[in-house]
């Protein structure tokens, strides 16, 4: 007998696997992917911390649908899912130039098939194209707000 939480985890895992499978067969697959930040993360929530360069000026947002590298690292050479479990104050500005993002590349890596336990009210998803998958959630049930950012990367 499945618990509701198990079913949500199972559905989320299958959704992520399907999105990555779909992007791997996309005729337009190349060295770039479309990435957009979670719309519910306000600029005020992206406060600087010891892991960020507070001296750099905030970048101006790109228009929706603009293309760039994955935003996590320009050195990625394989299709993968990058996972950044961070405190809200440590969320990297995915609109910033790529060299500012590389410091977040080694924080965490994930893998296909990993289970994520979350409830419907914690889950917010968006997918801008078959080349990229973005998914993030804010956990309001804990005092520490966790942010998960998954990005589908294309081979360079």
Curated annotation (Swiss-Prot):
GO terms for biological process: positive regulation of transcription by RNA polymerase II. It comes from the Eukaryota. It is found in: Nucleus. Expressed throughout the brain in the thalamus, subthalamic nucleus, corpus callosum, hippocampus, substantia nigra, caudate nucleus, and amygdala. GO terms for cellular component: nucleus. Residues 46-71 are annotated as: Disordered. The keyword Nucleus applies. Residues 48-59 have a biased composition (Low complexity). Keywords: Nucleus. May play a role in FOS signaling pathways involved in development and remodeling of neurons. Promotes transcription of the FOS promoter. This is Protein CROC-4. It comes from Homo sapiens. The lineage of its organism: Eukaryota, Metazoa, Chordata, Craniata, Vertebrata. The gene is MIR9-1HG.
């Amino acid at each position: 007998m499945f618990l509701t939480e198990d079913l949500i985890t199972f559905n989320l895992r299958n959704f992520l696997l399907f999105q990555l499978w779909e992007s791997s067969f996309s005729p337009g697959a190349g060295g770039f992917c479309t990435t957009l930040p979670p719309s519910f993360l306000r600029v005020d929530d992206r406060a600087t911390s010891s892991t960020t360069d507070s001296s750099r000026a905030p970048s101006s947002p790109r228009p929706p649908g603009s293309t760039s590298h994955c935003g996590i690292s320009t050195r990625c050479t394989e299709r993968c899912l990058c996972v950044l479990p961070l405190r809200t104050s440590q969320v990297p500005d995915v609109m910033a130039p790529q060299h500012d993002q590389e410091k977040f590349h080694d924080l965490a890596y994930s893998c296909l098939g990993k289970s994520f336990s979350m409830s419907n009210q914690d889950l917010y998803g968006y997918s801008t194209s078959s080349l990229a998958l973005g998914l993030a959630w804010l956990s309001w049930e804990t005092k520490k707000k966790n942010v998960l950012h998954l990005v589908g990367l294309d081979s360079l």
